[in-house]
Amino acid sequence: MDVNPTLLFLKVPAQNAISTTFPYTGDPPYSHGTGTGYTMDTVSRTHQYSEKGKWTTNTETGAPQLNPIDGPLPEDNEPSGYAQTDCVLEAMAFLEESHPGIFENSCLETMEVVQQTRVDKLTQGRQTYDWTLNRNQPAATALANTIEVFRSNGLTANESGRLIDFLKDVMESMDKEEMEITTHFQRKRRVRDNMTKKMVTQRTIGKKKQRLNKRSYLIRALTLNTMTKDAERGKLKRRAIATPGMQIRGFVYFVETLARSICEKLEQSGLPVGGNEKKAKLANVVRKMMTNSQDTELSFTITGDNTKWNENQNPRMFLAMITYITRNQPEWFRNVLSIAPIMFSNKMARLGKGYMFESKSMKLRTQIPAEMLANIDLKYFNESTRKKIEKIRPLLIDGTASLSPGMMMGMFNMLSTVLGVSILNLGQKRYTKTTYWWDGLQSSDDFALIVNALNHEGIQAGVDRFYRTCKLVGINMSKKKSYINRTGTFEFTSFFYRYGFVANFSMELPSFGVSGINESADMSIGVTVIKNNMINNDLGPATAQMALQLFIKDYRYTYRCHRGDTQIQTRRSFELKKLWEQTRSKAGLLVSDGGPNLYNIRNLHIPEVCLKWELMDEDYQGRLCNPLNPFVSHKEIESVNNAVVMPAHGPARSMEYDAVATTHSWTPKRNRSILNTSQRGILEDEQMYQKCCNLFEKFFPSSSYRRPVGISSMVEAMVSRARIDARIDFESGRVKKEEFAEIMKICSTIEELRRQK
């Protein structure tokens, strides 16, 4: 039927029409090849913003370093990193004055965290720069490798399991004259295959010991590896992001804990909360400004954008902030927190894989690793690359570039938010001492500024003053990219405000559909996404019902599980028809087994298995929930799982969904091609690590799991736990005498083996 599109909007308030402007239908762009060029761009831009600073040389590593702090005063219109220490300190002092006790309380909270955090905190997170192998690894492996190397070099404080003790080892490692590490390498030899009689290349993985002198070790400890940020929409150019090594991570974690604690107490901070909580917090600030702007006052809002936030921030400023925030605290605490910014002032950016060269005439491809860029002849490069390399050559050491100014992306989000809020805080009338005043919202580098004044001239004066105050602490508001509107319409962190935050439902569109994990998880995630959007994003009942029907259709096409009585022919239809005919209660069949859909918008919160359980044939129940089914390799399934949901804009979010373990919750097997590469040794380490952790969890189920106190190894803990459990089971009659004796014997054998080792 033909619909006149204007009819759709007859009863819709204008702000709800935002969902029709959705630009992001296709896949987001991904990067290929090396990120070396993007990293060099970052390095040269960062130095350019601070070029009038003072040059010094790091005495330990020999790296040239540029310090723009307290240098020339910043200029209007030109982005720069010339922050002034006294201005930052004064902003901090005023922030404390308007929030009495805020720093003191946050320090106390953080001190508690510092003393309790275990080193396994560092296993969270994805790819991490592993300094022992000089490339990225999963966080858990990188940590295991670091600890292993520390212990073989006589650094053992980490054995207590506390993060703070691991950090003591990090500090000591930097004073050592040399560190011995184990690296993986590959040997290739040509051998004749017995079966096919062809020559094949056989790869063997070796481990070899290598000594790093103090300078090389320090360079690695201070290195941030760089990658290209993927899936960024709305940008023509890609950009580099950084991943720090294990030496830096722990220190950063504590600084961010302190900053998070401060942000939680600041009404202008958009971090660390999210979602509806964030919207409520922000709406409060707007309400305050609107109600306080009397009838005579004008109120305007700037949807703000800062030029190159990270590249103009400076770790030395963060050091000044921390020194001020912790000024009345114990010496050890101040030292722990000041190490992260000091390490960042001496950081090195790893340039990545290097450049790929192709010779069209000779059909040759070769890679120039980053290490060679310092002394290769530049005639092979095109104009723009040549300029880039020439510019950063003086900064190169061992394939890394010295990068003292600037913060790499995403490192100190919370602390930089505190800096931004401290400037917003200065907008109160008691500080501006004139008729205009301002307030606003800050979330990492994103901000919204609300200015009130008696007339347009006052608004202009207020904006100018805010702009210049920001300049003094290294924040550069972009005049080109920020725009001003009457208060009541603005955008902040992809939330659109028009007399209240507008639900932009279309942003969630990419997360509708079938995830492709397995039949069980996909059904659960699909209905949860619809449910969540009804709660949070104004997804109305009729639209939700339609979304649900489309989802079921999509799901049936994906898994080829059309209803048993359908005419559609697929690879599975023969089996599903047979099942349909054998089943007495057809309503009990899961959708993935050709059953009908029983979901509607009222019961989206119930997992499908539970929804249909009473309707199922008994033998079907038995097959469906059978942990011994040999065709299903089971993960042990928690009652709640996490799925990663991709909205169109902003970071991927984790979403909880209910997981009921059935024979549909299969896990695909790992691709085997990795087993023939140099990654293999690492993969084996990782599996070993995984097995140990799983075993440990079997002994200490989460309900009874108290973090181990005192120093005992995992093995000792498990043995003593096994003995206690066995005794309890024996005394209550759950375990026979012979079994009990056997358990005790095994425990003794394990201890004996440990002693011999």
Swiss-Prot record:
E.C. designation(s): 2.7.7.48
Region (Disordered): 49-70
Quaternary organization: Influenza RNA polymerase is composed of three subunits: PB1, PB2 and PA. Interacts (via N-terminus) with PA (via C-terminus). Interacts (via C-terminus) with PB2 (via N-terminus); this interaction is essential for transcription initiation.
Catalytic activity, reaction form: RNA(n) + a ribonucleoside 5'-triphosphate = RNA(n+1) + diphosphate
Enzyme class (EC, first level): transferase
Domain RdRp catalytic: 286-483
Pfam families (UniProt xref): Flu_PB1
Protein name as it appears in the record: RNA-directed RNA polymerase catalytic subunit
